[in-house]
Amino acid sequence: AIEVFVNGQAVPGAISRCSYIRVDSGQDESSAHLACLLPGLSANDEIELKSYKATQNRVAVNMETASLYVERVADTRNVFSGTATEAVGGSMLNLREEEVEAGELALVWNSDRTGDAFGHSGETITLKDKGSYLVLVNVPLQGNVIRASVGLQLWLGGYEEGDIAIGGRAQQGFIRNVSNHDKSSIHFSGLITTTEANQDLVVETLQLAATGEITMGDKEASIYIEKVNDQSGLFFSTAETL
């Protein structure tokens, strides 16, 4: 696992635990990825990225080349940032869509920064302007469920008339529940484009494999959204085939 610390304190929503290695059928490599905003920093704060063992497996794991990019996000930039500890329906994240009412799987955000391009109420983030938005989401997972898998999807435009944003899925939240592997995480980084002003965005989790209780444990999810200039200096594409 990797986690970000500022002045020795763990940053809420800044953890990645999806680097599972099975050591079977040639699967002996993995990686952890994280992209988030560190709000409220002061001059001379110290940022650390720590890597630590997340299971009881005694096989040594060696690191290849890691990379780190840090950028100051000025107050003038139009961004939304927040954290979450549960969904509308509660802390349980491992539920199928057909088991619940529309909206119950959506994560409830506590905002720590809301720019002029955004509105916010609970689980709903309103993208006020038509255009493109960079979206980063991190969701920690914990639970004693054998072969559990929790996914994430970005729902754009409301439940009645909207749909999943193009490319708006993440599905790396696998939990083996062997050798103390009871933690994982889901991560999304991508660009979404609105076709009209004032479209609502919600982030949902959903069950993809075994049934059982999966929550965030004692950690938090995080989200970062920034309105980007899609008229110049930007490339974005989608793919459906190899």
What are the residue ranges of the model-derived segments?
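Extracellular beta-strand-rich recognition modules
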Residues: 1, 32-36, 44-53, 131-141, ...
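Terminal (often C-terminal
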Residues: 1, 56-148, 172, 213-242
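Short, surface-exposed beta-strand/strand-loop-strand elements in extracellular ectodomains
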Residues: 1-10, 147-160
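Glycine-biased low-complexity/repetitive sequence motifs
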Residues: 6, 12, 41-46, 126-127, ...
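Acidic glycine-/aspartate-rich tracts in secreted/extracellular proteins
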Residues: 10, 53-56, 208-210, 231
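Glycine-rich strand-loop-strand elements at beta-sheet edges
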Residues: 12-42, 118, 156, 161-196
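Exposed beta-sheet edge/beta-hairpin loop segments within beta-rich domains
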Residues: 36-42, 60, 124-126, 190-196, ...
